[in-house]
């Protein structure tokens, strides 16, 4: 399924070098509420989103830098894919392949978005110099460890980092995760997008990344 999308990346025309527009860190929830199949949906969904022709073109055009972090409990965060600049079709294809093959970092762990957000902010210490800094948090549950993320959110705002969130809600249920992210996690300039179940994750993530990397004009 990924192969045709990766082949499309070869169609991207080379572009003149430009300054990095956005440093985007994707923070994936791998806590105990995410089972084996759901983790694979997340990893494969990320790979497919990166290989989307529209997203791929913007990534290269704006020299966007991407990193991927997995998070779970209070002391469980891992930068699984370090900062990678999208300077060519080959670099986008390589990142998509790495996301597809990425092994799960943690199992049987709590859900601690506060410490995860602190770790994501720390990761920008080694990020390329980009005009915008964005953290994209995805998750399917509210915290049961690590306390409130309020201090981490304030820290992100002071650092000029936008925090957005993708809430994975069980089909037919309420919006507990979406409401928590909106109330306690995202920055004032951030947004929340909701996927109804993990099966909707891939398309929702694609729309979310496209929104995050598209330049706002006017």
Label each region the model flagged:
Residues 20-82, 85-86, 93-138, 164-177, ...:
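Von Willebrand factor
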Residues 171-217:
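Von Willebrand factor A/integrin I-like adhesion domains
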Residues 14-16:
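N-terminal signal peptide c-region/cleavage motif recognized by signal peptidases
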Residues 27-37, 82, 100-110, 138-143, ...:
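Second-shell loop/turn segments in exported
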Residues 142-183:
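VWA/integrin I-like adhesion module and closely mimicked acidic/polar interface patches used
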